[in-house]
């Protein structure tokens, strides 16, 4: 529940509250993955992006990857790939394209829009730079949703760093 409140804090611009959750309640034992805390790990990665720490994002998400793949956690996998793509993009690592393509392929297969659009302007420059050859009608709906999210979110997670 606290992780959800942290996400709300980020979206409403209360970054001090998000940082407090990170310091006091974010999972710390990344070497001993607790799959029941996957929402918390994803939230932790969001706060790390918010704080401008893309390297830490990758360390946080890496233990989740085998579980998500082996158990076919589609939505979690989309979030993991989008967050990883944003982190790689901010590090100027071209592997972001592979991660975003994987996220878009999965999201398009299930017609998920919100799972990607929630990242607003954090993902917008990636989407604009990626030549994705998937469903064009779905991508058009996705881009509209991403732009809408970008217009209403206050979080710095949505601000790309240069």
What are these regions (language model features)?
Residues 1-12, 39-51, 79-90, 121-129:
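Tandem amphipathic alpha-helical repeat scaffolds
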Residues 19-30, 62-69, 104-111:
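Amphipathic alpha-helical segments of tetratricopeptide repeats
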Residues 93-151:
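General nucleic-acid-binding
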Residues 155-161:
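Conserved small/polar residues in nucleotide/adenosyl-binding loops
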Residues 15, 54, 93-94:
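TPR-repeat structural position
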């Amino acid at each position: 529940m606290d992780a959800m409140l942290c996400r709300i804090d980020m979206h409403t611009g209360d970054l001090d509250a998000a940082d407090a959750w990170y310091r006091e309640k974010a999972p710390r034992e990344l070497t001993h993955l607790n799959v029941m805390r996957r929402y918390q790990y994803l939230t932790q990665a969001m706060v790390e992006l918010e704080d401008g720490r893309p390297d830490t994002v990758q360390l946080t998400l890496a233990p989740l990857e085998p579980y998500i793949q082996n158990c076919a956690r589609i939505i979690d996998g989309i979030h993991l790939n989008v967050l990883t793509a944003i982190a790689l993009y901010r590090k100027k690592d071209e592997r972001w394209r592979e991660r975003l393509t994987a996220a878009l392929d999965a999201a398009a297969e299930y017609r998920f829009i919100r799972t990607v659009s929630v990242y607003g302007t954090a993902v917008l420059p990636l989407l604009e730079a990626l030549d994705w050859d998937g469903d064009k009608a779905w991508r058009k709906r996705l881009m509209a949703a991403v732009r809408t999210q970008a217009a209403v979110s206050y979080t710095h997670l949505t601000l790309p760093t240069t």
